[in-house]
Design a protein with these regions (language model features):
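Alpha-helical transmembrane segments of multi-pass membrane proteins
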Residues: 52-55, 121-147, 166
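Short alpha-helical transmembrane segments in multi-pass integral membrane proteins
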Residues: 1-12, 72-137, 179-224
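Hydrophobic/aromatic residues in alpha-helical transmembrane segments
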Residues: 24, 28, 68, 109-110, ...
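Helix-terminus/linker motif at the lipid-water interface of multi-pass membrane proteins
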Residues: 22-50, 56, 74, 112-121, ...
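Structural signal for membrane-spanning alpha-helices in multi-pass inner-membrane proteins
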Residues: 29-32, 62, 106, 149, ...
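Small-residue-rich hydrophobic transmembrane alpha-helices
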Residues: 47-110, 141-163
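Hydrophobic faces of transmembrane alpha-helices in multi-pass small-molecule transporters and flippases
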Residues: 1-27, 52-60, 135, 161-165
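Hydrophobic alpha-helical transmembrane segments in multi-pass membrane proteins
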Residues: 14-26, 62, 94-103, 107, ...
Length: 224
């Protein structure tokens, strides 16, 4: 029974995070489709086209973040605190390095990549604009994803749910709705809202992880 409780305690927040991501995608499509500044179909198509290309960035970051759950959990269970700290530094540094590479790649080469997927000049323009803004968000996305998975590996899963809710719904979707629907700004203001949410979430996740690691350090002192 205790094992089942632990599985649900760690698994339910992760599952709810995926639900929030799907809900956020729905909200963004609705907001972009409600914009008066561009064609709704062009706005949604540009967002979805950019999202498909973005998977090139997300695949390695998700792989690193997911592997950290196993490695951190294994070392935490074995009370190898020295290895916990080293693997955290390694995972974060590699995630940031990869994200910076993709940021540079998308910012400078998106105008050459996107025409492969569409012939529409308006969709190409909006997608390039998307990457010119979101390119700056990728390092912060990497930090937020990695930190939340590290905390999950340490047996604390609810930060992942809270951080996803904070980033996707409370900040990103709210700012997009305010800028595009209320103020009537161009749709790229919605992506500025996403950039802001990614920066704030990365800062919160780092502070949260730092607090948890302080508790881990106290456990290490007791064990030693």
């Amino acid at each position: 029974i205790q094992i089942l409780k632990d599985i649900f305690r760690l698994g339910v927040p992760a599952s709810l995070s995926m639900v929030i991501m799907s809900m956020g995608l729905f909200l963004f499509n609705w907001i972009l489709g409600s914009s008066d500044t561009v064609s709704a179909s062009d706005a949604v198509a540009a967002y979805q086209t950019a999202g498909r290309i973005e998977h090139l960035f997300f695949l390695p970051i998700i792989s690193i973040a997911t592997s950290l759950v196993t490695l951190v959990g294994m070392f935490y269970g074995a009370k190898r605190f020295d290895l916990i700290y080293s693997i955290i530094k390694y995972g974060l540094s590699r995630s940031i390095g990869i994200s910076l590479t993709f940021s540079i790649f998308f910012i400078f080469f998106s105008q050459k990549i996107i025409p492969i997927f569409t012939n529409s000049s308006e969709i190409i323009r909006l997608s390039v604009l998307y990457f010119s803004i979101m390119g700056f968000a990728y390092p912060f996305i990497a930090v937020g994803m990695t930190c939340s998975r590290i905390m999950q590996g340490l047996g604390i899963a609810y930060p992942m749910f809270i951080l996803t809710l904070f980033r996707v719904v409370i900040i990103s979707a709210s700012l997009a709705w305010y800028f595009v629907i209320i103020l009537g700004k161009p749709i790229h203001y919605a992506w500025f809202g996403t950039l802001i949410s990614c920066i704030l979430t990365a800062c919160v996740s780092l502070l949260w992880l730092r607090g948890i690691l302080k508790r881990v350090n106290k456990i290490e002192l007791k064990v030693s």
